[in-house]
Amino acid sequence: MDSARAPTEDEIAKFLATRTSSQMLQLMRCIKQPAAQFAFTAKLLTITPVKNTPPTVPEKAKKALNAFVGFRCYYIAIPAFKPWPMKKLSNLISLLWEGDPNKSLWSLMAKAWSNIRDQVGKDQAPLDEFFGIICPHLELPDPAYYLDLHGWSLGVNQEGDPTLLRIIDSKPASIGIGHINLALSVEDIITFVQKAGFAPTYTPDANDTSPTFLGQSLSSTFEVNHPANSIPAASQVDQARVAARNRRRAKRQSARELEFQEKLENDLEFKEKINREMDLVLERTPPAGPDPLPDFDFTPFYEGVNNLICEHMAMEQSNAGYPEGAHLFNDFGIDSSKAYLGMDNFATDMPDLIDYDAFRLGANEDVALPVFDDIAHA
């Protein structure tokens, strides 16, 4: 029997490089001689580590482009939509899609672009360039004329948001008239765009035949071009949906307008009520200014007090010319028991009040004495 073959250096290096850390520690413990341990350690330092290649994960298949997404990417360029942000146009694009009669064509175009993208990548297959080539070929309406051709009118509601209204007596455009009686497949679309220079590196799979195609018979052509059947049945259903939606929106808008009008009327009525109450308050409030003087009734007593005060003030003013220390007749501080004529410096401010002729010697005793006003009030 042949003896065991000694492993080569490459085999030893591969063996050591594929060991785990715990296995390497066990090998180190098995070597007892110091020289052998040194040689083993030096060998470990020179070994090139083996790179573990992770298992290849199959690339996840990309999601195919949705027909509505393709429609939105193409017709978002409608010139009337430029002033508005995308969040305000989302509902409008959905409304256009519901009434669009070319949904089958958009499904074919979306599938064709998805096949090209999956092979060459999204960077090598720009979606806007793809639509710019194939849409005019299929005679789809240009974004600049789409609203007019399909009977749509863009307006603004009371909230300032854009809104679409269907024009009465308008007939939506059908699919491309030049291709209405031809069978159209995904491969036909890919072949056309490649001839136009789009995605030249794409290689179609000869064994893959797409079951997706679009075809119209001559009878369908007659039905579309006949005046009595100018609108397809599907388009009529879409129009009925749009009309129902517009009626619901108009009803909600009318309710909002009625509510706003009622609120405005209530506010005006409340304002008028406040104004009337303020007018009543102003009428009842006396005018601003000094307090009026009290209206006292006339009585003889108050009239006599008033005359006495006024006469006393007049006497004080008229007595200002007499000498200082003179005893005046109207001085209430003099002694009543002492005769006026016996006073020194006696003076009176009533020279014309007393008739002294009645008191001279030999005077007529029947002479009339002066009359004093205060006797009548005694």
Swiss-Prot record:
Example GO molecular function term?
Answer: DNA binding, bending
Question: Per the record, where are the segments of Basic residues compositional bias?
Answer: 244-253
Cellular component, GO, one term? nucleus
Q: Which InterPro entries match?
A: MATalpha_HMGbox
Respond yes or no to whether keyword Nucleus is given for this record. yes
Pfam families hit by this protein? MATalpha_HMGbox
**Per UniProt, which keywords does this protein have?**
DNA-binding, Fertilization, Nucleus, Transcription, Transcription regulation
What GO terms describe the biological role, i.e. biological process, of this protein? positive regulation of mating-type specific transcription, DNA-templated; single fertilization
Region (Disordered) residue ranges read: 235-256
Query: Which parts of this chain does the entry mark as a DNA-binding region?
Result: 60-117
Subcellular location field? Nucleus
Main subcellular localisation: nucleus
What does the UniProt function comment say about this protein?
Mating type proteins are sequence specific DNA-binding proteins that act as master switches in fungal differentiation by controlling gene expression in a cell type-specific fashion. Transcriptional activator that induces the transcription of alpha-specific genes.
* The family this protein is said to belong to: Belongs to the MATALPHA1 family.
From the Swiss-Prot or TrEMBL record, give the protein name: Mating-type protein MAT-1
Biological source species = Cochliobolus ellisii
